[in-house]
Amino acid sequence: MTNLNYQQTHFVMSAPDIRHLPSDTGIEVAFAGRSNAGKSSALNTLTNQKSLARTSKTPGRTQLINLFEVADGKRLVDLPGYGYAEVPEEMKRKWQRALGEYLEKRQSLQGLVVLMDIRHPLKDLDQQMIEWAVDSNIAVLVLLTKADKLASGARKALLNMVREAVLAFNGDVQVETFSSLKKQGVDKLRQKLDTWFSEMQPVEETQDGE
C-alpha cells in the first residue's frame, strides 16, 4: 500500500456541475456532509494546510464542486454541503442536482467520506448519501466529527450506536470518530484513503478522449 503525502495536496479547480469537471479518469474520493458537519476543517486537517479548503462562518456557502489533487490521477473532491435550511429553495435544488449528477455519473468516484456532527448523526440526508453509495458499490467512511465536544464515554457510546445502525445498509461502511481541533481520527482517515487510492482500479482515458 502506498503512503501518500497529503501535505502535497493542491487545489485544482471549482466547478458548478459535472460538465465543467476535468476528464473522468483516475480515482476520486469525495467528501460529503451537511453544511455544518466540518467538511472543510477535516480536509485542512488531513492535508495539514490551514486554508486548502475555505472554512466559512456561514454554513451553506460551498456551492461548487471543489477538486484537489493529492498525486497524479488521485483526487479529493469537496462536494457542496447539503441540508442547510436558510438557503433559497432554487439554489438548494441547483446544488442537489449538481450533487446527484456527480454521484451518479462520475466513473472515477470510488470512495465516499460522509461527515456528520457526532451530536446529530444519521440525519435523513446522511442516510440517503450512504444508501446511494452502497447501491452504487462505492465504499463509505463515516466520520463522526467534532468528537472533542463529547466526553470519552459518550463518544464511545455514540460510535458504537452508529456502527450498529449502519449494518442495516449491508455495504462497505466504516465508522470512525474525528476531531479537527484535537487531530483525532486523522490517522484512520489517511489509512483509509491510502487503501482506497492503492487498491481501487483507476479509470483510464478512453481512446476518443471522452
Swiss-Prot record:
The keyword Metal-binding applies. GTP binds at residues 33-40, 60-64, 78-81, 145-148, 178-180. One of its GO terms (molecular function) is GTP binding. GO terms for biological process: division septum assembly. Keywords: Cell cycle, Cell division, GTP-binding, Magnesium, Metal-binding, Nucleotide-binding, Septation. Necessary for normal cell division and for the maintenance of normal septation. This is Probable GTP-binding protein EngB. The lineage of its organism: Bacteria, Pseudomonadati, Pseudomonadota, Gammaproteobacteria, Enterobacterales. The gene is engB.
